[in-house]
Amino acid sequence: MDTADAIVEKLRAQCLARGAAGIQGLARFFRRLDRDGSRSLDAGELRQGLAKLGLALDEAEAQSVCRRWDRNGSGTLDLEEFLRALRPPMSQAREAVIAAAFAKLDRSGDGVVTLGDLRGVYSGRNHPKVRTGEWTEDEVLRRFLDNFDSSEKDGQVTLAEFQDYYSGLSASVDTDEEFVAMMSSAWQL
């Protein structure tokens, strides 16, 4: 195992120790480090971010990680590819059921789930806070969507964000059969 793989394994272990939301939390953390919105991190940003998580890298290690996930020769790591590598490996059955659940939510088929998509498959009408007048139905839908959304809370959930959410949960479910049954029941697939 080379340096970059060892670092990913350490980060993955930290995420799994945090439970089902660990990968999603780390994804949010790294996306916040991307201050310029380039969807990439340079070695300095990576070192700084990992240090905040208690994982110290020297310059050579940070460069190694950046080189591994540098998709365009810019010297920076592609954030989405790096986060994809951090997700615990999932079987094809798990990936397929997550994709099916996402597709059910993505009513418009444009690759993102929005409030408009949710209105067709999820009703907030009977939510206790709607019934008391505290929230509107749209507020319920937005808060539901925020569970899966990245830290920007842009009101859109991509398949990658949906996978981030479920990858941590997947790691805590022993068998594919249990995971598929859970997802099928939750999303009425």
From Swiss-Prot:
Binding sites annotated in the UniProt record for Ca(2+) 1: D34, D36, S38, S40, E45
Domain EF-hand: 21-56, 57-92, 93-128, 136-172
Gene3D superfamilies xref list: EF-hand
Residue positions binding Ca(2+) 2: D70, N72, S74, T76, E81
Tissue-specific expression: Abundant in the olfactory epithelium and the olfactory bulb. Low levels are seen in nasal respiratory epithelium, lung, kidney, cerebrum, cerebellum, brain stem, thyroid gland, heart and stomach.
Cross-referenced InterPro entries: Ca-bind_SignalingProt, EF-hand-dom_pair, EF_Hand_1_Ca_BS, EF_hand_dom
UniProt subcellular location: Cytoplasm
Modified sites of kind Phosphoserine: S38, S40, S74
SMART domains referenced in this protein's UniProt entry, alphabetically: EFh
Record keywords: Calcium, Cytoplasm, Metal-binding, Phosphoprotein, Repeat
Xref: Pfam families: EF-hand_7
Self-association state and partner proteins as the record states: Monomer. Does not form oligomers in the presence of calcium.
Function: Calcium-binding protein. May play a role in cellular signaling events (Potential).
Name listed for the protein in its UniProt record: Calcyphosin
Organism lineage: Eukaryota, Metazoa, Chordata, Craniata, Vertebrata
